[in-house]
Amino acid sequence: MNNNIINLIAAIILSLSIIFGWQYFVVKPEQKKQQQQIAVQKAENLKKQQLKALVEPATGIVVQEESQVQRIKIESESLTGSVSLKGLRFDDLILKKYKQDLSKNSPEVRLFSPANTENAYFAEVGLVSNLSSVKLPNNDTIWNSDSEILSPEKPVHLFWVNEDGVKFLVTITVDENYLFTIEQTIVNNSDKELPVQSYGLINRKYIAVEKAVNILHQGPIGCIDENLKEYSYDDIKDKKSEKFAASKVDWIGITDKYWLSSLIPDKSSNYSSNFNYALKQGTERYQVDFISPVQIIKPGENFSIKSRIFAGAKKVDLLDKYEKQYDIKLFDRAIDFGWFYIITKPVFYAMNFFYGYVGNFGVSILIVTVIIKLLMFTLANKSYRSMKKMKNLQPEIDRIKNLYSDDKARLNQEIMALYKKEKVNPVAGCLPILVQIPVFFSIYKVLYVTIEMRQAPFYGWIKDLSAPDPTTIFNLFGLLPFSPPSFLMIGAWPILMAITMFLQQKMSPEPADPMQAQVMKFMPLIFLFMFSSFPVGLLIYWSWNNILSIIQQYYINKFN
């Protein structure tokens, strides 16, 4: 193989080693340190008094603490919780289909919590006016309701009348998944014009999140003027506020790894929107909000506006459905598919398709890997032939190098003439490697960010494809009664990956350069330690890919 090609492959491997080495040796220890800091911070927060005020949105609305008031119970196939009738706030929401962990008695995932709790997180929509004389419902308003339960079969109708006789009506519906629709209607029975603006906000007490290097976005997010806007918590903290004036707002919200809360305003107008940070009495709070232009409601007229709140799991097919049904631009990008979006999402679709037949995402990964191998077989065959030719030409290349060692231009000219004469493409040998890089990262992304892979089992001891292999050779895979430190958690699947990688190397032509050949021999061992902390689903893919490559190499060797 030409030294330039060897150098290219070595550079690719070195780059991957640096990326994943940083993840393993730098990010992981930092995460452990952060987790300790989080534990200390939580202990301190328990001692703090209840908060008196939250972040103020650009509208001037002050989100205040809630007393014990009547609530409307939320009950659907996917959600349980309640809506506060004081201020009409969505602040109590549990995702019924998801557990916090794999333990037997694990509680369900809680998304929203009231403002006076440790993990405060809530959403609300409402009305404001630029005239203080206009009496509108506010955070202290107690709404009247025609029902105590909100379900997909039974919407809730709320009403409130101010001292001037103006009626405010709200209809709330929820579907079988995670979408609330809130329609606000104003019936102006007064003799005055009413200038009003509709707003929506999501407010969250800061919770330290797992930090990852260019792997996953968590924090404020939205689609504004058909462009995806993503800001980390640190970005907003530094800026204090990121404002967008008179923009087309498809949706704004706050995203976690698997969960999303977002506001979806009515498409009838543009909106001003903000991503905000505030420190109140030692507590950090983040808020996203929007506000509409002023709407003048004349005496005797009615005015209605509709908003939606999504609060739940970021299921790919569900976000796709809402995006199409309600024309919500880039809603699926709430899932951080990464740089290789155009590859990652089709890879997920393929895995999900086969999952529908086999009922196991691990098996689905195996099937998709076989399909990818078949699609790349012709390319791999041509690559192998080119590598063999390069290997056979190496003595002649060495002779040319010795002959023209003092004339670099003539040296390159003679080598290129040799390639042309023998019909050899010096780049062909590395094409399969280059093609596999985006596929590898796409599968990694699918395993890391999609809710469908969360707590998805394989067979045997693998209960979660998105988590590392829980076994380790250093306690004989659980036979010895102790738990090694995290950097020694080298399980059965990482070992299988390293073994198959070693066998694959044995069947491939060795680099002509002895030093490079020696480096390549150590790569399985290096990757063994680097990838032991990666999602086991990725190791299953890589091990199976290596096995298929060995079979493919055997076939090519036999028939070529």
UniProtKB/Swiss-Prot annotation:
Classification via InterPro entries: Membr_insert_YidC, Membr_insert_YidC_N, YidC/ALB3/OXA1/COX18, YidC/Oxa/ALB_C, YidC_ALB_C, YidC_periplasmic_sf
GO CC field: plasma membrane
Subunit structure: Interacts with the Sec translocase complex via SecD. Specifically interacts with transmembrane segments of nascent integral membrane proteins during membrane integration.
Keyword presence, Cell inner membrane: yes
Main subcellular location of this protein, as a coarse class: membrane
Record-annotated membrane-spanning stretches: 5-25, 334-354, 357-377, 431-451, 476-496, 522-542
Location in the cell: Cell inner membrane
Molecular function terms, GO-annotated: membrane insertase activity
Name this polypeptide is given: Membrane protein insertase YidC
